Amino acid sequence: MFTKPIIFVSFITIPIVSLFSAPKYILFGWEFGQTKLHELIEKAPYFDTLPIDGIGITPLTGQKDAIGRPMWSRYLMHTGPWQHEDVKPLVEDFRRLTSHKSMKECFFGKFFSSPTNRIAWTDDAVWARIGQNMRVLARLAKEGGVRGFGIDHEDYFRQEQFRHRRSDGDYAKTASLVRKRARQLFSGVFAEHPTAVIITFWLLSQEEIYFGEVDPVVTMRDRGDLWPAFINGIFDVMPPTAKFVDGDEKSYRYRADRGDFERAYVQQRTKAIRLVAPENRQKYMTLASMAFSVYLDMYLANEGDEWYQPPLNGSQLERLRDNLRGASFASDEYVWFWGQAHCWAKWPEKRRFNGHFKQEDFKRTWEECMNGLIDTIAQVKDPQAYGFKLWEESKKRGALKVMNRNSACLDDARKKKALPSPYAYWQDTYRRDTNGVFRIDSTFGEGDTSSICVEGVSHGSVILPIKGVQSGDWYAVEFSAFGEGVSGDVGWYKNSKWYKASGKVAVVFEDGVAKDSWRKARGVFRVPTGADGFGLIMGVHLMPGEKCHLDNVFVYKLEKEGVEK
């Protein structure tokens, strides 16, 4: 689960899009621009086994326009005009594709992209044709269950579509016209697909040059930048049911251990908004979602390469894990992956490939190149779901390893303190008026006649310490409680002292069980980097005269099948 604090900018509250849900992971890459629609449908069951929610698709459909030119988003800027009847036969195929759980968050890639030849902003006919094509694909997306559209306006063909030229005329008038064109294009899109999500590899996150300026509008004019005007035009016509996602492509280079993702999130919210017209700022705050990216090729690169992420604890996969964790924590809803040299799936025929890579590269999957990648992504995406699934699988194959002594909370005549080994206890007598009692009750227990009894402790805990663990190992804990005022969590040790560099993990009680009966609390977790032990903390918060009982305390080490040590 990923949460973040609510930030206040002036008087506007930033909405948290997915406060209590796992992030949505979207795959983009060269392989998906070379794939036929029927191939995607055939591979969808395989993608269902991956911890993903969708892909950016520009599949080859085989559809042609009236004069035989390919009809798909990558050709949208320079073909058409298209008609809905031209793509209507594809609706059922897209419904089949998006019926899969791994395809619920698919995006039409290259929906609006940089043109191969610069288009005059004054050319009404061309912009009308492009708008018609976009509207046709928007309707197809809505009817086919596709979540939305990808915008990639990077200037691959060096046409400077969003850079003002003197031949355009006055900058202010041109910027106004650009904003009008965006309204013209996207009013039709939202009319056909009012709940569309527009994901951009960058919305305003790349405009850092303006963030420190006293008057960014003046700087935009001096630089001839027309992109913010286009974005404002989209916001002009965006309904409250739609969403804009800033993918922050420069986050390829971010490092979680430097706090880069959190810094970028705050910067996007507090600085980028100055590039948004005042009348659209409320829309920006409520409809714009912040996302971050993972560039897979960087984790296979060699030191000295332009695109490179250094290893963490000797492993580039661990660096990917840490950065993915940072991206997932800081994003509002989406994290997207970009890959070039390899593929997620084995495809049935040779793919076209960029000259930077060998054809052989495309025969290897990312998992083959980074063993454990898919499992790592699953762990980061939803640690609780992953851990509980691993726990259940271990139970089924009888592989649970109990790591603690005295789970039954039996008395020990040799004990020198109120509770027997290995249990410790604590109450805050320094800052609170508490003077309760910890003891073994040999007359009452869950399934037997022994348990730990706590009486009158207003703020304290019973602690089960576990030492000698390794970072990256998975554990499960459970205990039973009778009575009110009991909570559970796990904290970390380093060199036998509390280690607070990583946050605690909650151990949660099952719902729907009366507090005048035994209740079970459970938790799962991965040991964080730097920790060499942990403590299961069974917290107690009792009123005078109240008591509670604790029993059946278990700590299990969890390991995937085939890797038990």
Where in this protein do the model-derived segments appear?
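Short, solvent-exposed coil/turn linker segments
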Residues: P15-I16, K36, P70-M71, Q83, ...
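Glycan-processing catalytic domains of CAZymes
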Residues: A22-R397
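Extracellular and organelle-lumenal recognition/adhesion modules and their flexible linkers in secreted
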Residues: E392-K565
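Bacterial N-terminal signal peptides
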Residues: I7-I16
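Positively charged n-region of N-terminal signal peptides that target proteins for export
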Residues: M1-P5
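Single-residue recognition of alpha-helix boundary sites
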Residues: P15, R179, G562-V563
